[in-house]
Amino acid sequence: MSLVHPDTSNYPFRFAPFLRQEYSFSLDPDRPVCQYYNSKEGASSCPNGTLCPNKHVLPIFQNKIVCKHWLRGLCKKNDQCEYLHEYNLRKMPECVFFTKNGYCTQSPECQYLHIDPTSKVQQCEDYRMGFCPLGTACPCKHVKKIICPKYVTGFCPLGRDCDWEHPPFYVPNELSKIRIKRDDEINTKKLDEEKERRLNAIINGELVI
């Protein structure tokens, strides 16, 4: 048995069945799809219910990208998750670090997709200038620039269907409120804290002078 990678198969836990039933922990991601499961009737259509060792996959959740939380073992939705719970390199989420910086520190071991920026759909220049004659048939991307006044005030009932832009909110700059302390102030505070700790230790009998 290795100290770095010990064999724990002989040490079962009483809560292991609960984790397997509720969160599908320790289940083979390549296990077959249950032939008895009916998406319309739910888990009751399978005689094994939530204890079934096979997958219960809803049709509307197929052909999705891989769940990023499942990759880290943190997804709690089990088979009800709207993302894939399997290793599929073609359906992995896009690497945020690579998209933002143009490179990835985890490459080539990174599990996420590294998409070439030049392969993405380019922004439509006609739409950016104010009008695109092709409309929805345009092969380029139409980026909304007019900010939605309802969204800025707090809520837009149209959501993603709104014709105006919903920009992300930014945290106000707090640099003006930051006060820079001198080294002597920091050292004095540390000295006072040390004296207070020693005094409390003496009072509690933890330190004898």
Swiss-Prot record:
It comes from the Eukaryota. The keyword Nucleus applies. The keyword Glycoprotein does not apply. InterPro entries: CPSF4/Yth1 (IPR045348), Znf_CCCH (IPR000571), Znf_CCCH_sf (IPR036855). A zinc finger (C3H1-type) spans 28-59, 61-88, 89-117, 118-145, 147-169. It is found in: Nucleus. GO terms for biological process: mRNA processing. Its main location: nucleus. Belongs to the CPSF4/YTH1 family. This is mRNA 3'-end-processing protein YTH1.
